[in-house]
Amino acid sequence: MVEYKPSPAPVTDLREALLDRVFAALSDATRRELVHRLAERECTVTELAAPFAMSLAAVSKHIAVLEKAGLVRRRKDGRTHYCSLKPEALTGALDWIAIYQQFWRQRFDALADVLKD
């Protein structure tokens, strides 16, 4: 019997997939607020859920999306789950944004030059 071994995905495909997950995770206002709060300090899931008008299970699902995107690390101590931000996961998104930031900066500078004349 022939065994099928898929070839590993090229590194660029993996980077693109991770970038897609990061932007998808950050597309939701609740998840952006969770990231904002975790940027300040490590929190329990219960602490993270407190300000939201949703169930603990719903907040936990949002956290799972952030985990899948590599933005959040969850650790367990007894029955308590602690979450912390993994800021290095934002590097790819920041690099992507920087490309377009430079692009638009150049465009606006060119426009400013045209308007001066």
Map each language-model feature to its residues.
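Amphipathic alpha-helical dimerization/coiled-coil segments
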Residues: 1-18, 36, 91-117
